[in-house]
Amino acid sequence: MKTHFITFLLLVGMSLGISSRLHAQSSYQPGEENLKAREEFQDNKFGIFLHWGLYAMLATGEWTMTNNNLNYKEYAKLAGGFYPSKFDADKWVAAIKASGAKYICFTTRHHEGFSMFDTKYSDYNVVKATPFKRDIVKELAAACAKQGIKLHFYYSHLDWAR
């Protein structure tokens, strides 16, 4: 009897949680600015997604740390060797714009927690943890603004180290 009661409570609790989430989703009304941004994004048709970070050094994909069961502390040491000496935001943006792309989406931080920008919330970033010491996002944003191309950001809240 006790097992049936606990099962019943779990089912009721789950159904209430699901119905409240469905209600929250159905009551969302995007604002004018949001709708305009969606339309603009749709009209742009073609953009380039730059998925770049420490994982590029291993040339095995952005999920390499978890897919290969790499120790986080060992993986984090990659930052000490990250020095993209040929990175030139102006050249990158010019080449992307010449391709006909209307926007760039850039991975500012992926699941391993490494940020491609300077942040006060973590020292595990391109400015504080690498010999490169330059804010890649800042440089990319300046080049996009100068050359008139939209810049969107991908930022992962997931963090394999936390």
Give residue spans per PLM region.
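Bacterial Sec-dependent N-terminal signal peptides
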Residues: 1-25
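Mature catalytic domains of secreted/periplasmic carbohydrate-active enzymes
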Residues: 24-162
